């Protein structure tokens, strides 16, 4: 081969170049085989390290995303009241006009001439729901109120919280020593406190009212003091009581003050019921006594009355206080000083007609 190469100089050069190229290629391949396992050995720890590092990083991101979602949900839950507050503020900012206060209308017959034609010398009408006086005629004039006093008697006796089924006996101290009026309840008669309340309010039984006041802790004198104390508490500045029945003309008040008393009494369901009951039968001894309501407007169901009390002595004239419901509204009506019972009833019916027509 050497001799052949010597003979062929050009071929020798070419062959040398080819052999050199093959040797270089073989050396490069062998070097690559040695380096590749070394790189693989180093690549595996790095890959593991990266995987270890990435795994908690992803978890942290996932936790952050979950926390973000929880925080967002909590924010949404707490955002509702804030939005409601904003809506409330917007609602408050744009308030609808206040409803017009009720009033009696001339188109319904309420005129100065009609008021002047009332039989009652003093009259007062109060719309309870709005606190608006609708009619006031001599409403602050002090005058005797007669048996309307028994409404305060009932309020104070009820506040004493004595057992209603307890028995009271009528004594000589319960007789009328002012007007010397009679009574169907004889001295020695016994009735429950419930029956005494019932006939004192419904039929204006004087001895029943007197017995309730005598039964008060401290006696009748303490009871009358409690009546005046309650009047002051209610703001009845022109009111004074001397005794519990109303027989004394020195039991005085005004139509405006009595509207306050009606408001206090109307809070007691028992007083409302007893004052508007039509009739009842009591048994003070061996026999029976039938009592009827002293107010003809209640007896004949002429008006939607929820509470009432009548009163009459010569010094006071005829009077009545009542709580009515007219078209869903509570109305207090006080009438004092009418010359006849028919006159005060006529005034009440007329005022109810004005109310029914005027209230929308």
Predicted feature locations:
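Alpha-helix N-cap/helix-start motif
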Residues: 220, 224, 251, 290, ...
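N-terminal Sec-pathway targeting helices
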Residues: 9-13
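Active-site/binding-pocket entry motifs
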Residues: 174-176, 206, 281, 296-298, ...
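Structured C-terminal helix/loop/strand segments within mature extracytoplasmic catalytic/sensor domains
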Residues: 3-8, 27-112, 126-135, 139-143, ...
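Short glycine-rich loop/turn motifs
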Residues: 120-122, 294, 318-321
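Bacterial N-terminal signal peptides
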Residues: 14-25
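Conserved active-site loop region of the serine DD-peptidase/beta-lactamase
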Residues: 267-301
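Active-site-adjacent loops and short helices of periplasmic peptidoglycan-processing enzymes
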Residues: 94-256, 260-269, 326
């Amino acid at each position: 081969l050497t001799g052949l190469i010597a003979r062929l100089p050009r071929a020798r050069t070419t062959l040398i170049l080819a052999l050199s190229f093959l040797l270089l290629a073989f050396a490069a391949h062998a070097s690559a085989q040695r380096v590749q396992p070394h790189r693989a050995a180093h690549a595996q720890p790095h890959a593991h390290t990266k995987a270890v590092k990435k795994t908690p990083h992803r978890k942290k991101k996932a936790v952050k995303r979950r926390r973000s979602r929880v925080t967002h949900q909590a924010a949404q839950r707490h955002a509702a009241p804030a939005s409601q507050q904003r809506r409330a503020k917007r609602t408050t900012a744009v308030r609808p006009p206040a409803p017009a206060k009720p009033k009696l209308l001339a188109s319904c017959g309420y005129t100065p001439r009609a008021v002047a034609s009332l039989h009652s010398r003093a009259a007062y009408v109060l719309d309870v729901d709005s606190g608006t006086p609708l009619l006031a005629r001599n409403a602050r004039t002090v005058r005797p109120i007669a048996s309307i006093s028994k409404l305060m008697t009932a309020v104070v006796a009820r506040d004493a919280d004595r057992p209603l089924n307890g028995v009271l006996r009528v004594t000589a101290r319960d007789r009328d020593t002012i007007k010397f009026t009679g009574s169907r309840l004889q001295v020695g008669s016994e009735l429950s406190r419930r029956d005494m309340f019932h006939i004192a309010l419904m039929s204006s039984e004087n001895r029943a009212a007197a017995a309730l006041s005598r039964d008060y802790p401290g006696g009748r004198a303490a009871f009358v003091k409690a009546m005046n104390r309650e009047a002051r508490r209610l703001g009845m500045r022109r009111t004074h009581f001397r005794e519990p029945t109303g027989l004394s003309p020195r039991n005085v008040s005004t139509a405006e003050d009595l509207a306050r008393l009606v408001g206090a009494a109307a809070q007691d369901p028992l007083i409302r019921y007893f004052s508007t009951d039509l009739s009842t039968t009591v048994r003070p001894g061996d026999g029976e006594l039938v009592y009827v309501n002293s107010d003809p407007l209640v007896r004949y169901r002429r008006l939607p009355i929820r509470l009432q009390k009548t009163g009459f002595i010569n010094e006071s004239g005829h009077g009545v206080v009542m709580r009515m419901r007219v078209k869903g509204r509570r109305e207090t009506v006080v009438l004092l000083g009418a010359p006849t019972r028919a006159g005060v009833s006529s005034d009440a019916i007329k005022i109810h007609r004005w109310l029914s027509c005027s209230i929308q």
